Amino acid sequence: MITVLSIILFLLLLTVGKERGVKTFFTFYLSLLLIIIYIVFMSIGMNAIIIALIICILSTITCLFILNGYNKKTKSAFISVMIVLLLIFGLIYIIGKRANIGGFSMESLESIGAFSYDINYDMVNVIIGMYLVCIIGTVIDTSISISSAMNEVLENTHKINDKELFTSGMNVGRDILSTTINTLFFALISTFIGFFMWHKGSTLGYILNYKVFVEDLIQLLISFIGSILIIPITSYISSKLLLHKSILSKSN
């Protein structure tokens, strides 16, 4: 069934997206391969946070430069994503260690009861790494959207300074922010429908302190923060880099 769905996906991407659609298809499976590599390296005992950072960098390179080419738009987006990744990593690390997130929920214990719990691995690092991997896609998407829009503004406007270009980037970011926030929110809530049915008789305090719910709620809030931070950072980086490149090309 997965093969059939993959073929349908490929045909739709080929029909609608043409060459870009084919690149998107193979980039998707390349990203999936990176996730598999991430899991394999964790299973042999490597630090989950370091692996996650490497995977995030490789995913950013894959999504930006393979799909969109190596140009001033993608360079601006790449720099912006790396800055946000470092900022979010610091925030996630502090919260993860202080909140002591990680481990298994009561529902998971039943399915893994036959296995040994002595895996000798820091589950807090696993969750921190998972947060980084989960947020990177949204940040990349927002960043390249803003950078591409700013590049279009610059190419179609004869006279514009860095402040005006920055403002245009911020306006684009504000336009897509609400959509991004809603997408992230409903993606989380949809996974918790079964959870809410399971605990429909529980108090609000019990649910808000439940391990699985808290971990995913933290992930959601961090994703919100990353989606917001990427807007001014991309707008600023792109306003400087794109305008600088434009001035150099005109002078030559």
Where are these regions (language model features)?
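Membrane-interfacial helix-loop-helix connectors in multipass membrane proteins
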Residues: 42, 99-120, 197-217
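N-terminal transmembrane hairpin
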Residues: 1-107
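Short helical (or helix-break) motifs at transmembrane helix termini and adjacent helical loops
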Residues: 137-153
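Pore-lining and gate-forming transmembrane alpha-helices of multi-pass membrane transport proteins
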Residues: 80-81, 117, 121, 125, ...
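Juxtamembrane helix-boundary/capping and inter-helix hinge elements in multi-pass membrane proteins
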Residues: 154-163
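Helix-loop junctions and hydrophobic alpha-helical segments within the transmembrane domains
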Residues: 162-177
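Hydrophobic alpha-helical transmembrane segments of membrane transport and translocation systems
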Residues: 12-20, 199-252
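Hydrophobic alpha-helical transmembrane segments in multi-pass membrane proteins
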Residues: 89, 93, 175-192, 227
